[in-house]
Amino acid sequence: MKLVSWNVNGLRACLGKGFLDFCAVADADIICLQETKMRPEQAEFDLPGYHRYWNSADKAGYSGTAVFTRRQPLSVTYDFGIDEHRHEGRVITAEYPEFYLVCCYTPNSKDQLARLDYRLAWEDDIRDYLCELDEKKPVVYCGDLNVAHQEIDIKNPGPNRRNPGFTDEEREKMTKLLSSGFVDTFRYLYPDKTGAYSWWSYRFNARKNNAGWRIDYFIVSERLKDKIRNADIWSEVLGSDHCPVVLDLDV
């Protein structure tokens, strides 16, 4: 099974930059999107063969997630049961016979870390949710998780130490998640690979210079790690400030 996750930074804009052509070439079984900034009624495009599920923010043109899947899930749920996390369209869970898929757009801690406290509470709550799912069946957790976990996951670690997405607090939350029975699929296969990034600032020619961050992930339950066939970062795909990340899973 091929799964793709991509923060499209506005799906309407990405549609004008070849999104449908990308979907045709990717030939994925499941496509997970973050930062769609789109409501379902605005989705005036055709994607034959896929069931489509949307979770939109209360605020128009902000956040949002979507899952496009060839296999119809057994069930689909939105958010994860905590009222303060219900309003930004950040999580979709699709249940399949073999696993739960959780598509997530993790809140950014914002400039001056204005939202760091909320972010850390989110991390604890979603980790609890993932662990609850994992007790029932394996979990595939993907999306823009807005953290570069280790120094190898960011081009310039030193100057970014207290910037959103690379604070010690955020990185420790990722460590705690992975210590709870989950595996970062890319680092499982490529523990020492450098220069592998999924997001680049639009400023300072960052993408041209590959001055990036790896903040987009596929994370799976520990008991799925032997079913990982490949995990990749498609850095050549344009259309957003992020690029797609891919997981091939033998399920």
Q: What are these model-derived regions, one by one?
A:
Residues 37, 43-109:
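Structured beta-strand-rich core segments of catalytic domains in phosphoester-bond hydrolases
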Residues 60-75, 204-226:
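Conserved beta strand-loop-helix elements of the APE1-like EEP
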